[in-house]
C-alpha cells in the first residue's frame, strides 16, 4: 500500500525567539512565534504524515490550547507521530519539502535539516529532500513577516 500526504504551515517572525527550522537552530535576529517551538518545517512534515495515514491534522494530536505542548520541541512531536506510523507498518518512501522565506538564507542549513529529518524518520537522507525559495519580496514572507513551509510525503506499507 502506498499513501501520500501533504502539509503546510506558517509562523510569524518575532524578536526574542529562537529560529528553529527542520530541527536546526539557525542564528538570526528573529525566531518563529508559536505555541510550541514553531518549527514550521517539522510542522508541515508532521501534518503531511498525519494526512497520509488519514488521521486528521497536527492540531488534533497537539492542540495549541493544551499547555502540555507550550514551547514543545517539534522534533519530539514528529517522533511521537512517526512511532505510531511505524507501529502501523509504514515506512518512508520519500519526503520533499520546501521552506519559503526571504531571510535568512536557508542554503547553509539544508543538509543539517535533511540529516535531522532522516534521523527522526528512521530513513536514509537520500529519501529526504529539503529546499528553500523566496517569494521575490511578495506577500508576508517577502515582507519578512513570517516563514512558510510545504511538505509532501510518500509512505509505503
UniProtKB/Swiss-Prot annotation:
Catalytic activity reported: 4-CDP-2-C-methyl-D-erythritol 2-phosphate = 2-C-methyl-D-erythritol 2,4-cyclic diphosphate + CMP
Site feature: Transition state stabilizer: 35, 134
Cited Gene3D superfamilies: 2-C-methyl-D-erythritol 2,4-cyclodiphosphate synthase (3.30.1330.50)
EC number assigned by the record: 4.6.1.12
Positions with a binding annotation for a divalent metal cation: 9, 11, 43
EC primary class: lyase
Organismal lineage: Bacteria, Bacillati, Bacillota, Bacilli, Bacillales
CDD domains referenced in this protein's UniProt entry, alphabetically: MECDP_synthase
Keyword Transcription: no
GO molecular function: 2-C-methyl-D-erythritol 2,4-cyclodiphosphate synthase activity; metal ion binding
Keywords, sorted A to Z: Isoprene biosynthesis, Lyase, Metal-binding
Residues the entry annotates as binding 4-CDP-2-C-methyl-D-erythritol 2-phosphate: 9-11, 35-36, 57-59, 62-66, 101-107, 133-136, 140, 143
Pathway membership: Isoprenoid biosynthesis; isopentenyl diphosphate biosynthesis via DXP pathway; isopentenyl diphosphate from 1-deoxy-D-xylulose 5-phosphate: step 4/6
Name of the molecule in the record: 2-C-methyl-D-erythritol 2,4-cyclodiphosphate synthase
Note describing how the cofactor binds: Binds 1 divalent metal cation per subunit.
Pfam hit, one: YgbB
Origin superkingdom: Bacteria
SUPFAM superfamilies per the UniProt record, alphabetical: IpsF-like
GO BP terms in the entry: isopentenyl diphosphate biosynthetic process, methylerythritol 4-phosphate pathway; terpenoid biosynthetic process
Cofactor list: a divalent metal cation
Record's function text: Involved in the biosynthesis of isopentenyl diphosphate (IPP) and dimethylallyl diphosphate (DMAPP), two major building blocks of isoprenoid compounds. Catalyzes the conversion of 4-diphosphocytidyl-2-C-methyl-D-erythritol 2-phosphate (CDP-ME2P) to 2-C-methyl-D-erythritol 2,4-cyclodiphosphate (ME-CPP) with a corresponding release of cytidine 5-monophosphate (CMP).
Quaternary context: Homotrimer.
Protein family: Belongs to the IspF family.
Residue stretches spanning the membrane: none
Amino acid at each position: 500500500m502506498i499513501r501520500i500526504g501533504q502539509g503546510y504551515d506558517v509562523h510569524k517572525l518575532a524578536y526574542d525567539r529562537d529560529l528553529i527550522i527542520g530541527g536546526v537552530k539557525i542564528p538570526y535576529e528573529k525566531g518563529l512565534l508559536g505555541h510550541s517551538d514553531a518549527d514550521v518545517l517539522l510542522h508541515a512534515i508532521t501534518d503531511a504524515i498525519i494526512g497520509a495515514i488519514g488521521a486528521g491534522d497536527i492540531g488534533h494530536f497537539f492542540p495549541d490550547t493544551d499547555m502540555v505542548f507550550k514551547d514543545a520541541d517539534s522534533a519530539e512531536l514528529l517522533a511521537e507521530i512517526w512511532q505510531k506510523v511505524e507501529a502501523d507498518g509504514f515506512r518512508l518512501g520519500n519526503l520533499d519539502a520546501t521552506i519559503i522565506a526571504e531571510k535568512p538564507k536557508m542554503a547553509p542549513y539544508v543538509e543539517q535539516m535533511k540529516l535531522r529529518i532522516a534521523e527522526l524518520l528512521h530513513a536514509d537522507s537520500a529519501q529526504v529532500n529539503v529546499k528553500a525559495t523566496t517569494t521575490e519580496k511578495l506577500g508576508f514572507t517577502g515582507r519578512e513577516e513570517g516563514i512558510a513551509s510545504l511538505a509532501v510525503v510518500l509512505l509505503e506499507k
